[in-house]
Regions:
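Outer-membrane beta-barrel signature, preferentially recognizing the C-terminal barrel domain
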Residues: 48, 55-112, 122-156, 183-187
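Hydrophobic core residues within well-ordered beta-strands of beta-rich domains
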Residues: 2-4, 16, 34, 47, ...
Length: 209
């Protein structure tokens, strides 16, 4: 596999910026693929607003294609018939940044063709003979869509102390069946705090998450 990537940053008018990128991927099995990226940003004062589009391509890994692994009676099996995964990602983002406070929110849609995922399938006679109780196999999901929102907040409280948190919502579905994708997480979040102290040439940093 070989990949080449080029990117250019273009500033135009006042407070406007564009980032244009193009990746070329050559894979000895799945041949050539171009994946473009375009991001537009408008920055009035302490605010940034972005709109982004990017195309993605992921070839199946060797593990997903060929390897069989067994652990505690569960067999994870490769699949030589896997197709490469392709995606089209669209996002809008807004953020505010100051010395003491920042907040960022992103809404996105990711449309995927041939999403590679692991699904439970029926046991074979060989599995049963080898005391396998569960068989998982890598398969392609023909059409999938992930719609989500990411929010993060950070604040500086003084005396070297900062506090932050994040929340993510992701609705991941097989669009052909309208069923949730296996092992997808719909809600997630985190809270973290940080204390930073500088003594001359030395810095002490303590982080709790």
């Amino acid at each position: 596999t070989m990949a080449l990537y080029t990117q250019d940053e273009i500033k135009f008018l006042q407070n406007f910026q564009a980032i244009v990128g193009l990746r070329y991927i050559y894979h000895e099995t799945f041949k050539n693929r171009f994946t473009p990226k375009l991001s537009l940003m408008y920055s009035p004062g302490a605010f940034n607003f972005r709109a982004t589009y990017s195309s993605g391509f992921r070839a199946p890994s060797l593990e997903e294609l060929y390897y069989n692994k067994e652990k505690n009676g569960t067999l994870s099996a490769g699949n030589i018939n896997l197709k490469p995964e392709k995606s089209n990602y669209y996002a809008i983002n807004g953020e505010f940044m100051s010395r003491l406070f920042s907040i960022s929110a992103t809404a996105y849609i990711n449309n995927l063709d041939n999403l590679i995922t692991s699904k439970q399938v029926a046991l074979t006679e060989t599995d049963i003979a080898n005391s396998i109780t569960k068989r998982m196999e890598y398969q392609n999901v023909d059409k999938a869509r992930v719609k989500g929102v990411d929010i993060s907040i950070n604040s500086y409280l003084g005396y070297g102390i900062s506090l932050g948190g994040s929340y993510s919502f992701a609705d991941a579905k097989d669009t052909n069946t309208d069923s949730r994708l296996p092992r997808s997480i719909k809600h997630s979040g985190s809270i973290n705090s940080n204390w930073n102290k500088v003594w001359g040439f030395y810095t002490l940093n303590v982080n709790l998450a």
